[in-house]
Each structure stands twice: as C-alpha cells, then as structure tokens.
C-alpha cells in the first residue's frame, strides 16, 4: 500500500502496517525510475513474523487503537 505523508511516498506492509521504504515524491513527478524494489527489500525486510501487539517497540499506535476499540454496528440500530 502507498501512503503519502510529509512530501514522501511510503510503502507499507498491509498486514502489519509497518513502513519499510520512503521515496521522495519528486522521483515520481520527474518520471525517474527508482532502484529496483528487490534492492530495498534486502535493506529493509518486512516484519511479517512480528506481532506488533506483543512487541510495543514495533507497534503501530493506530493499529493498536483500532484493534482495541469495541465492535459495534451503527448502521442497523
């Protein structure tokens, strides 16, 4: 998933919402080709086997907030 923030485009792992690469937007606007993604996967591996709720150092606050919220159905009340 691509996320725009503070002038950069961040690629996120959709399972953990852990950001693993930031690319300046200017590279996209100029039509320049960034280095192959495989190069960055070796430098910044995805944290697929880390449970962010067990390891608070790696936890994403928004994901923790969403998972701890009570499940309610406001559409059919």
Swiss-Prot record:
It is found in: Plastid, Chloroplast. GO terms for cellular component: chloroplast. It comes from the Eukaryota. Keywords: Chloroplast, Plastid. Pfam families: Ycf15. Its main location: plastid. Belongs to the ycf15 family. This is Putative uncharacterized protein ycf15.
């Amino acid at each position: 998933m691509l996320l725009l923030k503070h002038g950069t485009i961040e690629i996120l792992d959709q399972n953990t919402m852990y950001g693993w690469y930031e690319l300046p937007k200017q590279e996209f606007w100029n039509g320049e080709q960034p280095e192959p993604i495989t190069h960055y996967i070796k430098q910044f591996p995805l944290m697929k086997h880390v449970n962010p709720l067990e390891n608070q150092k790696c936890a994403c606050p928004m994901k923790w907030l969403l998972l701890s919220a009570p499940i309610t159905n406001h559409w059919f009340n």
